[in-house]
Curated annotation (Swiss-Prot):
The CRAL-TRIO domain is known to bind small hydrophobic molecules. SMART domains: SEC14. The gene is ATCAY. It comes from the Eukaryota. It comes from Homo sapiens (Human). Residues 1-54, 331-371 are annotated as: Disordered. It is found in: Cell projection, Axon; Cell projection, Dendrite; Presynapse; Mitochondrion. It is linked to Cerebellar ataxia, cayman type: Found in a population isolate on Grand Cayman Island and causes a marked psychomotor retardation and prominent nonprogressive cerebellar dysfunction including nystagmus, intention tremor, dysarthria, and wide-based ataxic gait. Hypotonia is present from early childhood. Residues 11-29 have a biased composition (Basic and acidic residues). GO terms for cellular component: axon; cytoplasm; dendrite; growth cone; mitochondrial membrane; neuron projection; neuron projection terminus; perinuclear region of cytoplasm. Residues 171-328 form the CRAL-TRIO domain. This is Caytaxin. GO terms for biological process: apoptotic process; mitochondrion distribution; negative regulation of glutamate metabolic process; neuron projection development; regulation of protein localization. Residues 115-120 are annotated as: Required for interaction with KLC1. The record marks 105-106 as: Cleavage.
Amino acid sequence: MGTTEATLRMENVDVKEEWQDEDLPRPLPEETGVELLGSPVEDTSSPPNTLNFNGAHRKRKTLVAPEINISLDQSEGSLLSDDFLDTPDDLDINVDDIETPDETDSLEFLGNGNELEWEDDTPVATAKNMPGDSADLFGDGTTEDGSAANGRLWRTVIIGEQEHRIDLHMIRPYMKVVTHGGYYGEGLNAIIVFAACFLPDSSLPDYHYIMENLFLYVISSLELLVAEDYMIVYLNGATPRRRMPGIGWLKKCYQMIDRRLRKNLKSLIIVHPSWFIRTVLAISRPFISVKFINKIQYVHSLEDLEQLIPMEHVQIPDCVLQYEEERLKARRESARPQPEFVLPRSEEKPEVAPVENRSALVSEDQETSMS
């Protein structure tokens, strides 16, 4: 019965659908007889000028966040409490089990704006017309260390406010030419060891290209290793003539060294000096300052060098040690007294009469012949 009456009432009601904002009040349509929530209202031509605070409105559902105690203690509700530290067992990490990279897994390179980069066989590389670019370096499509065939390892350095690139692949066998020999005195006074025996042979086809890149490597190494005052120990022993650096190369090194490095150089010790290195320095006097010439010091043995600098961290090549032993052996043999040479008695010559006695004998013979 009630259902039938409700149906008859709904047939007489004209329902019009419209979009209504939930919270913002707006004028009701003129031809509506139903309130938003279904309660009948009077049809008025003027919009309402008051808000209905007593009527039923739709309310949004508000989510209340749980109370969190932001503190560093482990009390209940704190961020450091055990309630927030529940993690599955597979996420537990033991720091001791983490493997650290080996020294061989990383490339050693220096800072101060220097950076390593790989350059493939690109037009930039081929345009430089460098030795070995026309074909593989070893002819079998692989490099010396088994890496990419057309890849070269480069280092970008800044020398004298100019950017240069060093071909590390070409100078790799000669990098031992410059080493750090520790410190002397108080502070960071570095000892730079230059071993001439590790220089390339002048008969190599790419000798000038190698020396140019090796020159940049030596200069950049000095700028990285030197912090304050320093000295250079030049190991000249066991170096054949074909590996001696030329005058032009030494002149270029001196001219491109930064003024700070030239000023902070306190001594240049030349160990086992040869006549060639003395001649080179004598010829180089016109373009070398007098202050630099006064810093040169000659040392003839490693024993004398030990009296000047600490030798704990100075790496002496094996060929230089062997050269030192040969020199000491030759010096001992030359200092040994030589035995006097005495003729045996059977080989002794008969005594010769003096000149006066000989003239007397001649006169006696003449007298006997005249008589």
